[in-house]
Amino acid sequence: MVRDKHYENLFLLPAAQTRDKNAVTPEQMAKLCDTLKDECFDYIIIDCPAGIEQGFKNAIAGADSAIVVTTPDISAIRDADRIIGMLEANGLHKPKLIINRLRKDMVKRNEMMSPEDINEILAVDVLGIIPEDEDVVVASNKGDLLVSNQQSKAGLAYRNIVKTILGEDNNDENSFEKKTLLGTIKAMFVKG
């Protein structure tokens, strides 16, 4: 495992680079996750490809819950719907959703699906919305952590998602929902 240079409690376990995609079985992956849980890791996040290949099967074998990440375009929403069905069929009920690369200007012009449209189609709880942000590319190319960039809208969205996962108060005024009319109305009733 590789320890992150910025966060001492963050580790990365890279996938084996082998041509044989069946080198690790779902049973071995489940055992690895159980071992890591026993080592006192609070969260184990497994990034996996979408689809029915071995990497997906391995990832869900060791998972207690799932987060599906999608973009607001029709083909990605169809894929997300298929993945949600596969997760539920494999016992991972009530997956959460992250909507990535959302552009408010395109939503307002009805050129991109809104979070409400996506939620209506997929019928799962939205964990967070990450806006399109050029800082993502800049941070990636520099090897920086976007979550540390206090000026980045995507970085803020990542931090809000983490707060939600941790069960912390997440009433950030910069979230996408708070900037919409519906979000403003909701906020008025929630605040009192």
How should each PLM-predicted stretch be described?
Residues 20-23, 105-107, 147-149:
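A generic structural signal for short coil/turn motifs at secondary-structure boundaries
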Residues 125, 160-192:
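P-loop NTP-binding site
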Residues 22, 26, 151, 175:
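Conserved phosphate/pyrophosphate-binding and hydrolysis machinery centered on Walker-type P-loop NTPases
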Residues 27, 31-39, 43, 48-141:
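Conserved catalytic-core segment of NTP-binding enzymes
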Residues 137-146, 163, 167:
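Short helix/strand-capping connector loops at secondary-structure junctions
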Residues 142-157:
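C-terminal boundary of histidine-terminating zinc-finger modules
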Residues 1-38, 140-142:
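P-loop/Walker-type NTP enzyme "switch/lid" segment
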Residues 28-36, 157, 161, 165, ...:
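Generic hydrophobic alpha-helical segments
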